[in-house]
Amino acid sequence: MAVFLKSTIFAPMKEFLQILRRFVPPYKKYLGLSILFNILSAILNIFSFAALIPILQILFKVDGGIRVNEYMHWNGDWGSIKEVATNNLYYYIQEFIVVHSASTALLVIGIFLAFMTFLKTGAYFLSSATIIPIRTGIVRDIRNQIYQKINSLSLGFFSEERKGDIIARMSGDVQEVENSIMSSLDMLFKNPILILFYFVTLICISWQLTLFTILFVPPFGWFMGVVGKKLKAHSIEAQALWSDTMSMVEETLGGLRIIKAFCAEEKMNKHFNQVNSSYRDNIMRVNIRQQMAHPMSEFLGTILIVVVLWFGGILVLDYGRIDGPTIIFYLVMLYSIINPLKEFSKASYNIPKGLASMERIDKILQAEVEIKDKENPEHISSFEHQIEFRHVSFAYTDRKSAELVYVLKDINLVIPKGKTVALVGQSGSGKSTMVDLIPRYYDVQEGEVLIDGINVKDLAVHDLRMLIGNVNQEAILFNASFKDNIRFGKTDATDEEIANAAKIANAYEFITKSEHGFDTNIGDRGGRLSGGQRQRVSIARAILKNPPILILDEATSALDTESERLVQDALEKLMKTRTTVAVAHRLSTVKHADEICVLHEGRIVERGTHEELIKKEGYYKKLHDMQQV
C-alpha cells in the first residue's frame, strides 16, 4: 500500500510543489498573509465551537446545568494548564448563572459564539482573498512566459509544431492549470493549518478517540487513490485531442477559400465532428472520474463519523471518560477536520489534470532556444563591406527516418556592399533557406555566413537583425492601424517620417483615402487590403527602418500586373544605396541585378548577369524560355 500511495498521492503532490516553487516566489507577501489569516481562522473556529460545551450543559442540565467548581489559582499546583483553564471557565460561568440566571448566561455565551464566528469568517475571507492575487498572477506569468518563449524560439521549432496545438496550450492548457492546480492553492496553504490545529484540539479532548480515528484514515486515502490513479493519463490524452480540434479550426480559417472552391464543407464538417466527438468522449471520462471526488469523500466521511460516534458512545456510556456535550464538541471538530480532508481528496483528482496540462506547457517553456547570443557577442552598428557565404551547407532532420536532408550544399558567394544579388531557381532549390541564414533565422551545419568578415553566430542577434530589412512574398501585417504597422520596427518614428515612407512605397494615396487615414485598422493580417496594398505597406515599413541590407523574398510573385508595377517601383526606390539579396520567381524582376545566382538542388550551378547567363544557354536560359512561353 505504501508504494501505491507514493505513486498515486505523493508523486503528484511532489510535482505540484515543484510547480509552485517555480511560480510562487514573486507572491511571497500574499502567501504570508494567507497563512497568517488561516492560522487566525483556525484558532477562532476552535474557540467558537468550544462555546458549545457550556451551552449544551446549560440546555441539557448536565451536572445540574453546569459543573460546580472552585476557583483555582493559576500558579497553584493543580495539574495541567488545560485543567486549570477549563475549571476556571466553568467557575466564572457558574458565578454568572448564580447572579444573572442560566438563560442570561446562555444568551451571553451565544453572543460570544456569534462574535467568534464573525471573526472566524472574516479571517477565512481574508485568507481566501489573499490567495486570489497568487492564483491570477501565476496564470498571467505562465501566459507571459509562453508568449516570450514563442518569440525567442527559432523558426525551426515551429516547422515541427502545429500552430493550433501551440494556441491550445496557451489557451486550454493554461486554463486547465488555473482551474485544476491554482484552485488547489487553498488546499495547500489553508487545509494543512486547519488540520493541524483541529487535530491538536481532538487530541486534547480525547487522545483515545483520536487514536481510534487515525486508524481509518490510511485505508480511506488508499481507496480514494484507486479512483484517481489514471486521471493524469486521461487528461494528457484529452488535451492532445483539444489541440487537434484547435489545429483544425486554425487550418479551416486559413483555408476557407479552398474548402469552398472544392465544395468540401460537408467533408470538413464530418472530419471536425469526428475530432470533436473524440475529445468529448475523453473529457467526459475525465470529468466523471473527477466528479466522484465529492460524493465518495462525503460517504467515507459519514462512515468515519458513525464509527467515531459508536466508539465515543462506549467511552461515554460504559467508561464515563467523557461527557455528552464534550463528545458532541469532538464530533463537531472532527467534522471540521473532514472538510479539509475532502479538499485534499478533490485535489487528488484536480491536480493530475493540471499536471497533465503543465507537462504540455513545459514542452514549450523548456524547449531549447537554438538561436541565441553566445557569451560576450560582438556588437555591430553598421554594414561596411560584404556578406559572404563560405562553404555553407544546411540540412534538416527528417522526422520519419531521422536522417539529415540537405537543402544547401557547399554554397560560396560574396555580396559586396551596395550590390544587388538575385537568387533564382525552381521551388525547393534552397533560395528562401539561403536568405534566412543571413539574419540567422537558422544556423548552418557546415561553413560560415559572414557580415564584414564576422561569423553571424558571433554577432549579437539584435544588432544583426537591425541591419536587415525584409519584404516577403506574403506581406506579414498585424491587426492594427496603418501607422502602427509601418512603424513596427521603429516605434519612435514621427508622423512625418511615417508619411514619407508611405509616399516612397506608393502607399500614401490609398492610406489617406481610407476612413481614418493612417489610424485606420487594416484587419487581421491586413485582410481589408488588396495584395498589392499589403505589400506596399510592408515596403513602407522596411523603408522606415532604413536598413543597409535588404532581403526580398519573391516580393512581387503573387501580384497582378498593375500592383506589380507599383510595388516594383517602390522596391526600386527602396533598393537604392542598399545591399539587396532578392529571391525571384519571375526572372523579369531581376534582369538588372548586379549578379544572378542560379540554384538547383541546393547548389549554385550558374552565376552572372542576365545577359551573360542568357548567352551561356544553360539552366538559367531554360528557366527564362519557360517563362516566355
What are these regions (language model features)?
Residues M1-A50, L59-L113, L119, L126-I131, ...:
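Membrane-integrated ABC transporters
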Residues F4-I9, K374, I380-V629:
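ABC-type nucleotide-binding domain
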Residues F10-R21, Q57, G64-I93, A129-Q175, ...:
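Extended non-transmembrane interhelical loops and adjacent amphipathic helices
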Residues P25-K29, L155-G156, G172-I181, L185, ...:
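An intracellular "coupling" helix at the cytosolic face of ABC transporter transmembrane type-1 domains
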Residues L36, A123, S127, S171-F216, ...:
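Hydrophobic alpha-helical transmembrane segments of ABC transporter permease domains
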Residues F37, S41, M116, D186, ...:
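Transmembrane alpha-helical core residues of multi-pass small-molecule transporters
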Residues N45-I53, Q57, L107, F112-K163, ...:
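Juxtamembrane helix-loop junctions of ABC transporter transmembrane domains
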Residues T201-L215, M224, R289-E359, I364-L365:
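Helix-loop-helix
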